[in-house]
């Protein structure tokens, strides 16, 4: 198999970015720049690249094959134990950067790979805690914290973001709270693309209506927040009005930041 045949294979399996994905895949294994592929499109490639291309065509995300993903211009380690960082989530990190000042405390609930809290702490001299229920995901976050040299300013804690004395204490101490929680309806997950279904179900499943985490965070945690603190939540494409109504019932303000497609994506709660 060569570059041209890999592009053909990926295209036949409905991968829109076949050319770029093929070049990145090959570059990962042979250490050559992606441009090498165009100049050597018909050169036979080793079996390990062929096997990786077949996995990619079958629906395994490229990021899980290469073990890397980009977020806020930085490279992060990822594995099938964590969600793959997405461009729309950068709006959440950017919102945190606007609210977090030097010396403040940041709390990231459902931290996953740690890309949100790490990207913020790289840019603001503050401290923070990332909370994650999954031990394997927490190991990924620790590795990323080491890669990006965050040091003692970041604590990573294994706890249930929905039900933990540790979390309620952290909420009461934080100046800025961020979360990209699970928000997909349980019965929708199995209808999604193979790429999405490859991601950890624990990080996708937001309960029957996708609102489990928002209900807890907004109804209960906002009452614990100190004066002046803000909560920033990524929400699903069709959840903004329900989140707004939830904030109204809880007696807290709510505004939204739109994503690259003009969809309300980040709820600013406080």
Name each model-derived stretch:
Residues 15, 124, 146-151, 224-227, ...:
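Short helix-capping segments at alpha-helix termini
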Residues 87-190:
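Conserved SAM/SAH cofactor-binding pocket of Class I
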Residues 208-269:
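Conserved Class I SAM-dependent methyltransferase catalytic core
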